[in-house]
Design a protein with these regions (language model features):
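Transmembrane-helix bundle of Major Facilitator Superfamily
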Residues: 2-177
């Protein structure tokens, strides 16, 4: 990867374009990470709705990090084949399709398939959070960009159960997805 960034001004200052690009990627990653833990409070309600036991319902939580983890090394291959923009939009589309499938799931199998799609999109989004600042910021500003991304991304899994519980209590589990 080159040390030359593609959107930096000659004076080395951070531009609104750079901030916007990284903010969009970090927001996508935040939502993907939030989705990893937001389902925890919904498990009892989902168990009741689909008449499944706890060991079966646990797949809702387990499948996400499993598939997401598999997709991270796959994304290295994809980054070599496609632009970061195309990968971001593709991963976001896969994540959104999975989300829609989960929200409309008529049974547990469709819910799991939706979670697999969400996780596949998430697994491609996560590496982009590291790659995009390297492409967008000059060397001397990359640490700042990565630090900001890290702060936002660490909040996703932390607030997931709280947000999930509040949404479930107010609107139901399908809205939360």
């Amino acid at each position: 990867m080159s040390d030359n960034c593609t959107v930096a001004p000659a004076n080395g200052r951070i531009t609104g374009t750079q901030i916007s690009i990284v903010a969009v990627v970090v927001l996508g990653a935040f939502l993907a990470l939030l989705n990893q833990t937001v389902m925890s409070p919904a498990l009892p309600v989902i168990m009741s709705d689909f008449a499944i036991d706890a060991s079966t319902a646990q797949w809702i939580m387990s499948i996400y990090p499993l598939v997401s983890g598999i997709m991270v090394p796959v994304s290295a291959f994809l980054i070599d084949k496609f632009s970061t923009r195309a990968l971001f939009f593709g991963a976001t589309l896969v994540f959104a399709l999975g989300t829609l499938l989960c929200a409309a799931a008529p049974d547990f199998l469709f819910l799991i398939i939706g979670r697999v799609l969400q996780a596949a999109g998430s697994g491609v989004l996560m590496p982009l959070v590291s790659v995009v600042p390297m492409l967008v910021f000059p060397v001397e500003k990359r640490g700042t960009a990565m630090g900001m991304a890290g702060i936002v991304m660490s909040a996703g899994p932390a607030v997931g159960p709280v947000v999930g519980g509040a949404v479930i209590d107010t609107y139901g589990w399908r809205t939360m997805i």
